[in-house]
Protein backbone atom coordinates (compact mmCIF):
# COMPACT_ATOMS: atom_id res chain seq x y z
CA UNK A 1 0.00 0.00 0.00
CA UNK A 2 2.92 2.33 0.79
CA UNK A 3 4.41 1.71 -2.67
CA UNK A 4 1.07 1.99 -4.43
CA UNK A 5 0.17 5.35 -2.90
CA UNK A 6 2.82 7.45 -4.70
CA UNK A 7 1.97 5.66 -7.93
CA UNK A 8 -1.74 6.46 -7.47
CA UNK A 9 -0.94 10.08 -6.72
CA UNK A 10 1.28 10.24 -9.81
CA UNK A 11 -1.52 8.93 -12.01
CA UNK A 12 -3.88 11.51 -10.53
CA UNK A 13 -1.47 14.37 -11.24
CA UNK A 14 -1.04 13.08 -14.80
CA UNK A 15 -4.83 13.02 -15.19
CA UNK A 16 -5.07 16.63 -14.09
CA UNK A 17 -2.34 17.57 -16.59
CA UNK A 18 -4.37 15.90 -19.36
CA UNK A 19 -7.46 17.96 -18.61
CA UNK A 20 -8.70 20.04 -21.62
CA UNK A 21 -7.17 23.52 -21.77
CA UNK A 22 -9.40 26.35 -20.71
CA UNK A 23 -11.04 24.52 -17.80
CA UNK A 24 -10.74 25.82 -14.27
CA UNK A 25 -7.77 24.40 -12.44
CA UNK A 26 -9.92 23.16 -9.62
CA UNK A 27 -13.27 21.74 -10.67
CA UNK A 28 -15.44 20.14 -7.98
CA UNK A 29 -14.98 16.65 -9.35
CA UNK A 30 -11.21 17.03 -9.71
CA UNK A 31 -10.83 18.58 -6.28
CA UNK A 32 -12.85 15.84 -4.69
CA UNK A 33 -10.85 13.16 -6.46
CA UNK A 34 -7.56 14.82 -5.47
CA UNK A 35 -8.66 15.09 -1.88
CA UNK A 36 -9.72 11.48 -1.83
CA UNK A 37 -6.40 10.34 -3.31
CA UNK A 38 -4.43 12.51 -0.93
CA UNK A 39 -6.36 11.20 2.03
CA UNK A 40 -5.76 7.61 0.97
CA UNK A 41 -2.06 8.02 0.14
CA UNK A 42 -1.07 10.66 2.70
CA UNK A 43 0.43 13.83 1.24
CA UNK A 44 4.21 13.92 1.87
CA UNK A 45 4.12 10.33 3.12
CA UNK A 46 1.94 11.06 6.18
CA UNK A 47 -1.44 9.46 6.63
CA UNK A 48 -4.36 11.77 7.38
CA UNK A 49 -6.73 10.84 10.16
CA UNK A 50 -9.45 13.13 8.82
CA UNK A 51 -12.18 11.52 6.69
CA UNK A 52 -12.22 12.30 2.97
CA UNK A 53 -14.72 15.01 2.05
CA UNK A 54 -17.88 13.75 0.40
CA UNK A 55 -18.24 14.34 -3.36
CA UNK A 56 -21.19 16.50 -4.32
CA UNK A 57 -23.40 14.67 -6.81
CA UNK A 58 -23.43 16.00 -10.38
CA UNK A 59 -26.76 17.26 -11.73
CA UNK A 60 -28.76 14.50 -13.36
CA UNK A 61 -29.99 16.74 -16.22
CA UNK A 62 -33.45 16.26 -17.70
CA UNK A 63 -35.94 13.77 -16.33
CA UNK A 64 -36.28 10.60 -18.39
CA UNK A 65 -39.61 11.60 -19.93
CA UNK A 66 -38.34 15.01 -21.03
CA UNK A 67 -35.19 13.46 -22.48
CA UNK A 68 -37.25 10.96 -24.48
CA UNK A 69 -39.43 13.74 -25.87
CA UNK A 70 -36.30 15.62 -26.88
CA UNK A 71 -34.98 12.48 -28.58
CA UNK A 72 -38.28 12.07 -30.46
CA UNK A 73 -38.20 15.64 -31.76
CA UNK A 74 -34.59 15.31 -32.89
CA UNK A 75 -35.40 12.03 -34.63
CA UNK A 76 -38.34 13.57 -36.54
CA UNK A 77 -36.25 16.49 -37.76
CA UNK A 78 -33.47 14.11 -38.72
CA UNK A 79 -35.89 11.94 -40.73
CA UNK A 80 -37.16 14.92 -42.73
CA UNK A 81 -33.62 16.02 -43.51
CA UNK A 82 -32.47 12.48 -44.40
CA UNK A 83 -35.36 11.83 -46.79
CA UNK A 84 -34.64 14.97 -48.80
CA UNK A 85 -30.91 14.25 -48.81
CA UNK A 86 -31.23 10.58 -49.78
CA UNK A 87 -33.67 11.42 -52.56
CA UNK A 88 -31.20 14.08 -53.74
CA UNK A 89 -33.78 16.84 -53.29
CA UNK A 90 -32.67 20.30 -52.17
CA UNK A 91 -36.14 20.97 -50.79
CA UNK A 92 -39.53 19.29 -50.59
CA UNK A 93 -41.33 19.41 -53.98
CA UNK A 94 -44.03 22.08 -54.00
CA UNK A 95 -46.92 19.79 -54.91
CA UNK A 96 -50.27 20.30 -53.18
CA UNK A 97 -52.89 17.65 -52.53
CA UNK A 98 -55.06 19.04 -55.34
CA UNK A 99 -52.17 18.82 -57.82
CA UNK A 100 -51.48 15.25 -56.70
CA UNK A 101 -55.07 14.29 -57.52
CA UNK A 102 -54.68 15.74 -61.02
CA UNK A 103 -51.30 14.17 -61.76
CA UNK A 104 -51.83 10.76 -60.18
CA UNK A 105 -52.69 8.38 -63.03
CA UNK A 106 -55.71 6.13 -62.60
CA UNK A 107 -53.84 3.26 -64.20
CA UNK A 108 -53.11 -0.44 -63.43
CA UNK A 109 -49.31 -0.13 -62.88
CA UNK A 110 -49.69 2.32 -60.01
CA UNK A 111 -52.30 0.19 -58.28
CA UNK A 112 -50.14 -2.90 -58.77
CA UNK A 113 -47.27 -1.21 -56.97
CA UNK A 114 -49.55 -0.21 -54.10
CA UNK A 115 -50.97 -3.74 -53.88
CA UNK A 116 -47.65 -5.54 -54.25
CA UNK A 117 -45.78 -3.62 -51.54
CA UNK A 118 -46.92 -2.94 -48.01
CA UNK A 119 -46.91 0.82 -47.51
CA UNK A 120 -48.33 0.86 -43.99
CA UNK A 121 -44.84 0.88 -42.51
CA UNK A 122 -45.62 -1.78 -39.90
CA UNK A 123 -44.93 -4.99 -41.82
CA UNK A 124 -41.89 -7.03 -40.88
CA UNK A 125 -38.98 -6.56 -43.23
CA UNK A 126 -37.37 -9.70 -44.69
CA UNK A 127 -34.27 -10.88 -42.90
CA UNK A 128 -32.16 -10.02 -45.95
CA UNK A 129 -32.64 -7.06 -48.26
CA UNK A 130 -30.72 -5.40 -51.10
CA UNK A 131 -29.35 -1.87 -50.95
CA UNK A 132 -27.53 0.29 -53.47
CA UNK A 133 -25.25 1.64 -50.78
CA UNK A 134 -25.39 2.67 -47.17
CA UNK A 135 -27.00 6.02 -47.83
CA UNK A 136 -28.68 6.89 -51.15
CA UNK A 137 -32.09 5.64 -52.21
CA UNK A 138 -32.37 2.83 -54.75
CA UNK A 139 -34.70 3.42 -57.69
CA UNK A 140 -36.72 0.43 -58.87
CA UNK A 141 -39.67 1.88 -60.78
CA UNK A 142 -39.95 5.21 -62.59
CA UNK A 143 -43.23 6.61 -63.91
CA UNK A 144 -42.64 9.55 -66.23
CA UNK A 145 -45.68 11.66 -67.08
CA UNK A 146 -46.09 13.04 -70.61
CA UNK A 147 -45.12 16.68 -71.00
CA UNK A 148 -45.61 19.26 -73.71
CA UNK A 149 -43.39 18.90 -76.76
CA UNK A 150 -40.71 21.37 -77.84
CA UNK A 151 -41.95 24.11 -80.25
CA UNK A 152 -39.29 22.93 -82.71
CA UNK A 153 -41.40 19.84 -83.51
CA UNK A 154 -44.76 21.62 -83.61
CA UNK A 155 -46.64 22.93 -86.63
CA UNK A 156 -49.34 25.51 -85.89
CA UNK A 157 -49.07 24.64 -82.20
CA UNK A 158 -49.48 20.88 -82.53
CA UNK A 159 -48.82 18.23 -81.46
CA UNK A 160 -48.59 19.30 -77.82
CA UNK A 161 -48.12 15.73 -76.59
CA UNK A 162 -45.98 13.88 -75.77
CA UNK A 163 -42.44 14.35 -74.48
CA UNK A 164 -40.90 12.23 -71.69
CA UNK A 165 -37.98 13.52 -69.65
CA UNK A 166 -35.53 11.19 -67.88
CA UNK A 167 -32.80 12.17 -65.43
CA UNK A 168 -29.15 11.17 -66.03
CA UNK A 169 -29.39 8.78 -63.09
CA UNK A 170 -32.23 6.84 -64.75
CA UNK A 171 -30.48 6.82 -68.12
CA UNK A 172 -27.44 5.10 -66.58
CA UNK A 173 -29.49 2.25 -65.07
CA UNK A 174 -30.28 -1.05 -66.71
CA UNK A 175 -33.84 -0.93 -68.08
CA UNK A 176 -35.60 -4.23 -67.47
CA UNK A 177 -39.00 -3.15 -68.76
CA UNK A 178 -40.44 -0.06 -70.45
CA UNK A 179 -44.10 0.39 -71.29
CA UNK A 180 -46.04 3.30 -72.70
CA UNK A 181 -49.57 3.55 -71.29
CA UNK A 182 -52.31 5.27 -73.29
CA UNK A 183 -55.92 5.69 -72.26
CA UNK A 184 -58.52 5.11 -75.00
CA UNK A 185 -61.93 6.72 -74.66
CA UNK A 186 -64.95 4.41 -74.45
CA UNK A 187 -66.77 3.40 -77.65
CA UNK A 188 -70.57 3.03 -77.90
CA UNK A 189 -70.23 -0.33 -79.66
CA UNK A 190 -67.42 -2.85 -80.35
CA UNK A 191 -64.93 -1.37 -82.78
CA UNK A 192 -61.50 -1.93 -84.29
CA UNK A 193 -59.05 0.81 -83.37
CA UNK A 194 -55.79 1.49 -85.19
CA UNK A 195 -53.21 2.89 -82.77
CA UNK A 196 -50.00 4.38 -84.12
CA UNK A 197 -47.03 6.00 -82.45
CA UNK A 198 -44.91 8.47 -84.39
CA UNK A 199 -41.48 9.70 -83.37
CA UNK A 200 -41.13 13.46 -83.66
CA UNK A 201 -38.20 15.26 -85.24
CA UNK A 202 -37.49 18.96 -85.70
CA UNK A 203 -38.30 20.36 -89.12
CA UNK A 204 -35.18 20.73 -91.26
CA UNK A 205 -34.32 22.47 -94.53
CA UNK A 206 -37.41 23.79 -96.24
CA UNK A 207 -39.58 21.65 -93.97
CA UNK A 208 -40.52 24.50 -91.68
CA UNK A 209 -43.94 25.76 -90.81
CA UNK A 210 -45.43 27.22 -93.97
CA UNK A 211 -42.71 25.73 -96.19
CA UNK A 212 -42.92 22.86 -98.58
CA UNK A 213 -41.12 19.53 -98.37
CA UNK A 214 -37.95 19.16 -96.34
CA UNK A 215 -37.21 16.73 -93.51
CA UNK A 216 -39.85 14.37 -92.21
CA UNK A 217 -41.39 15.42 -88.92
CA UNK A 218 -43.05 12.06 -88.19
CA UNK A 219 -41.43 8.62 -88.19
CA UNK A 220 -43.73 5.72 -87.43
CA UNK A 221 -42.24 3.45 -84.78
CA UNK A 222 -45.23 1.38 -83.64
CA UNK A 223 -48.60 0.39 -85.09
CA UNK A 224 -51.24 -1.72 -83.34
CA UNK A 225 -54.67 -3.06 -84.19
CA UNK A 226 -56.89 -3.16 -81.09
CA UNK A 227 -60.36 -4.61 -80.66
CA UNK A 228 -62.36 -2.53 -78.19
CA UNK A 229 -65.42 -4.00 -76.50
CA UNK A 230 -65.57 -1.94 -73.31
CA UNK A 231 -67.84 1.06 -72.84
CA UNK A 232 -65.87 2.33 -69.85
CA UNK A 233 -62.57 3.20 -71.50
CA UNK A 234 -59.41 1.13 -71.79
CA UNK A 235 -55.77 1.46 -70.74
CA UNK A 236 -53.51 0.16 -73.51
CA UNK A 237 -49.85 -0.68 -72.86
CA UNK A 238 -47.21 -0.68 -75.59
CA UNK A 239 -43.73 -2.17 -75.25
CA UNK A 240 -41.31 0.74 -75.49
CA UNK A 241 -38.04 -0.81 -74.34
CA UNK A 242 -36.29 -0.70 -77.72
CA UNK A 243 -37.21 2.94 -78.33
CA UNK A 244 -36.10 3.86 -74.83
CA UNK A 245 -32.72 2.20 -75.34
CA UNK A 246 -32.15 4.33 -78.44
CA UNK A 247 -33.15 7.46 -76.51
CA UNK A 248 -30.77 6.62 -73.67
CA UNK A 249 -27.91 5.98 -76.09
CA UNK A 250 -28.64 9.21 -77.97
CA UNK A 251 -30.56 11.60 -75.67
CA UNK A 252 -30.51 14.27 -78.37
CA UNK A 253 -32.83 12.09 -80.47
CA UNK A 254 -35.61 12.24 -77.87
CA UNK A 255 -37.95 14.93 -79.20
CA UNK A 256 -41.07 13.11 -78.09
CA UNK A 257 -43.81 11.13 -79.80
CA UNK A 258 -47.28 11.66 -81.23
CA UNK A 259 -50.03 9.18 -80.33
CA UNK A 260 -53.15 8.53 -82.42
CA UNK A 261 -55.86 5.89 -82.03
CA UNK A 262 -58.53 6.16 -84.75
CA UNK A 263 -61.79 4.23 -84.85
CA UNK A 264 -63.56 3.42 -88.19
CA UNK A 265 -65.26 6.83 -88.17
CA UNK A 266 -61.91 8.63 -87.90
CA UNK A 267 -62.36 9.71 -84.27
CA UNK A 268 -59.13 9.87 -82.28
CA UNK A 269 -59.79 7.94 -79.04
CA UNK A 270 -56.36 8.51 -77.44
CA UNK A 271 -56.40 10.91 -74.48
CA UNK A 272 -53.36 13.14 -74.94
CA UNK A 273 -54.49 16.44 -73.45
CA UNK A 274 -55.69 17.41 -70.01
CA UNK A 275 -59.20 18.52 -70.82
CA UNK A 276 -62.22 18.39 -68.51
CA UNK A 277 -62.66 14.90 -67.06
CA UNK A 278 -59.21 13.77 -68.24
CA UNK A 279 -57.48 14.07 -64.86
CA UNK A 280 -55.27 11.04 -64.28
CA UNK A 281 -55.76 9.77 -67.86
CA UNK A 282 -52.70 11.38 -69.45
CA UNK A 283 -50.14 9.10 -71.20
CA UNK A 284 -47.18 8.01 -69.09
CA UNK A 285 -44.11 5.80 -69.32
CA UNK A 286 -43.50 3.00 -66.81
CA UNK A 287 -39.90 1.84 -66.34
CA UNK A 288 -38.52 -1.02 -64.30
CA UNK A 289 -34.81 -0.41 -63.73
CA UNK A 290 -31.98 -2.20 -61.97
CA UNK A 291 -29.17 -0.54 -60.04
CA UNK A 292 -26.04 -2.03 -58.49
CA UNK A 293 -26.90 -3.44 -55.08
CA UNK A 294 -25.20 -5.23 -52.25
CA UNK A 295 -26.40 -7.60 -49.56
CA UNK A 296 -27.03 -6.43 -46.02
CA UNK A 297 -28.53 -8.24 -43.07
CA UNK A 298 -31.21 -7.07 -40.68
CA UNK A 299 -31.00 -7.69 -36.94
CA UNK A 300 -33.64 -6.67 -34.40
CA UNK A 301 -32.76 -5.14 -31.05
CA UNK A 302 -34.37 -4.74 -27.65
CA UNK A 303 -37.73 -2.90 -27.56
CA UNK A 304 -39.17 -0.62 -24.89
CA UNK A 305 -42.43 1.32 -24.78
CA UNK A 306 -43.18 4.91 -23.78
CA UNK A 307 -44.36 3.80 -20.34
CA UNK A 308 -41.21 1.83 -19.60
CA UNK A 309 -39.13 2.78 -16.56
CA UNK A 310 -35.97 1.53 -18.26
CA UNK A 311 -33.18 4.12 -18.03
CA UNK A 312 -30.63 2.24 -20.11
CA UNK A 313 -30.22 2.59 -23.87
CA UNK A 314 -33.31 1.17 -25.58
CA UNK A 315 -35.38 1.38 -28.78
CA UNK A 316 -38.73 3.18 -28.53
CA UNK A 317 -41.63 3.32 -31.03
CA UNK A 318 -42.08 6.39 -33.22
CA UNK A 319 -44.62 6.77 -36.05
CA UNK A 320 -43.78 9.32 -38.75
CA UNK A 321 -46.85 10.95 -40.33
CA UNK A 322 -46.02 12.63 -43.65
CA UNK A 323 -49.47 14.25 -43.86
CA UNK A 324 -48.72 16.00 -40.57
CA UNK A 325 -45.57 17.40 -42.22
CA UNK A 326 -47.66 18.69 -45.13
CA UNK A 327 -45.68 16.48 -47.49
CA UNK A 328 -48.43 15.65 -49.99
CA UNK A 329 -45.78 14.82 -52.62
CA UNK A 330 -45.25 11.46 -50.91
CA UNK A 331 -47.89 9.14 -52.37
CA UNK A 332 -47.16 6.16 -50.12
CA UNK A 333 -46.64 5.39 -47.34
CA UNK A 334 -48.57 8.16 -45.65
CA UNK A 335 -46.98 7.07 -42.37
CA UNK A 336 -44.46 4.51 -41.16
CA UNK A 337 -42.84 3.24 -37.95
CA UNK A 338 -39.37 4.74 -37.70
CA UNK A 339 -38.45 4.16 -34.01
CA UNK A 340 -35.76 6.03 -32.09
CA UNK A 341 -33.06 5.41 -29.46
CA UNK A 342 -32.94 6.89 -25.99
CA UNK A 343 -31.34 6.07 -22.66
CA UNK A 344 -28.15 6.19 -20.68
CA UNK A 345 -24.86 4.52 -21.52
CA UNK A 346 -22.53 3.64 -18.67
CA UNK A 347 -18.87 2.65 -18.81
CA UNK A 348 -19.14 -1.12 -18.65
CA UNK A 349 -15.42 -1.85 -18.34
CA UNK A 350 -12.40 -0.09 -16.91
CA UNK A 351 -10.35 1.61 -19.61
CA UNK A 352 -7.25 -0.05 -20.99
CA UNK A 353 -4.80 2.21 -19.12
CA UNK A 354 -5.14 3.27 -15.44
CA UNK A 355 -4.48 6.95 -16.17
CA UNK A 356 -7.35 6.96 -18.74
CA UNK A 357 -9.71 5.64 -16.09
CA UNK A 358 -8.51 8.28 -13.64
CA UNK A 359 -9.06 11.05 -16.20
CA UNK A 360 -12.63 9.88 -16.75
CA UNK A 361 -13.33 9.62 -13.04
CA UNK A 362 -11.78 13.01 -12.26
CA UNK A 363 -13.55 14.82 -15.11
CA UNK A 364 -16.50 12.77 -16.42
CA UNK A 365 -18.02 15.72 -18.31
CA UNK A 366 -14.79 16.29 -20.20
CA UNK A 367 -14.56 12.68 -21.33
CA UNK A 368 -16.26 11.41 -24.47
CA UNK A 369 -18.39 8.56 -23.22
CA UNK A 370 -20.58 6.12 -25.15
CA UNK A 371 -23.89 7.37 -26.57
CA UNK A 372 -27.20 5.59 -27.18
CA UNK A 373 -27.46 5.43 -30.95
CA UNK A 374 -28.89 3.21 -33.72
CA UNK A 375 -26.58 0.29 -34.45
CA UNK A 376 -28.77 -1.35 -37.09
CA UNK A 377 -31.21 0.22 -39.53
CA UNK A 378 -33.37 -0.97 -42.44
CA UNK A 379 -34.97 0.70 -45.49
CA UNK A 380 -38.51 1.68 -46.42
CA UNK A 381 -40.23 1.57 -49.81
CA UNK A 382 -41.59 4.89 -51.03
CA UNK A 383 -43.75 6.11 -53.92
CA UNK A 384 -43.37 9.84 -54.47
CA UNK A 385 -43.32 12.79 -56.86
CA UNK A 386 -39.90 14.27 -57.56
CA UNK A 387 -39.26 17.94 -58.34
CA UNK A 388 -40.04 17.30 -62.03
CA UNK A 389 -43.50 15.89 -61.17
CA UNK A 390 -42.40 12.36 -62.09
CA UNK A 391 -43.65 9.45 -60.02
CA UNK A 392 -40.77 7.46 -58.54
CA UNK A 393 -40.90 4.17 -56.66
CA UNK A 394 -37.76 3.32 -54.75
CA UNK A 395 -36.14 2.09 -51.57
CA UNK A 396 -34.66 4.52 -49.02
CA UNK A 397 -32.03 2.88 -46.79
CA UNK A 398 -31.50 3.60 -43.12
CA UNK A 399 -34.97 4.91 -42.25
CA UNK A 400 -36.12 2.36 -39.63
CA UNK A 401 -34.20 1.83 -36.38
CA UNK A 402 -33.90 -1.93 -35.82
CA UNK A 403 -31.50 -1.95 -32.91
CA UNK A 404 -30.01 0.53 -30.44
CA UNK A 405 -26.75 0.29 -28.58
CA UNK A 406 -24.00 2.23 -26.84
CA UNK A 407 -21.16 3.24 -29.07
Swiss-Prot record:
Protein keywords: Cleavage on pair of basic residues, Cytokine, Disease variant, Disulfide bond, Glycoprotein, Growth factor, Secreted, Signal
Protein name: Growth/differentiation factor 11
Family as reported in the entry's similarity comment: Belongs to the TGF-beta family.
SMART domains: TGFB
Subunit-structure text: Homodimer; disulfide-linked. Interacts directly with ACVR2B. Interacts directly with ACVR2A. Interacts with ACVR1B, TGFBR1 and ACVR1C in an ACVR2B-dependent manner. Interacts with FST isoform 2/FS-288.
Example of a GO biological process term: camera-type eye morphogenesis
Species for this entry: Homo sapiens (Human)
CDD domains named among the record's database cross-references: TGF_beta_GDF8
Gene name for this UniProt entry: GDF11
PTM field: Synthesized as large precursor molecule that undergoes proteolytic cleavage by furin-like proteases. This produces an inactive form consisting of the mature C-terminal portion non-covalently bound to its cleaved N-terminal propeptide. Activation of the mature form requires additional cleavage of the propeptide by a tolloid-like metalloproteinase.
Disulfide bonding pattern of the chain: 304-314, 313-372, 341-404, 345-406
